[in-house]
């Protein structure tokens, strides 16, 4: 798989992380070619921190790693989808996702049905 990092002036492609089991979007990060290759070789989500200007592996300080199940490129090969198995909270603020959503298998359908009926 080839990602078109050259499309972006900073050579950082958006990387959407999705829970491999629930399908819930967990976070958005950015990858340069080095982060992409490290993620592929180690099967752990590694990104490029725009604020720290360095690679960081999700969970390197918290222990909440993202084990990679699959990596896909979009139709233009300029965006990355990572299907992962999270170990604990994904957001640095302590929530399941960086979008403030709960990430649980199965129960979400029942919760949606309940809110629709109520």
Over which residues does each language-model region extend?
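C-terminal binding/interaction regions
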Residues: 2-14, 20-21, 25-26, 31-118
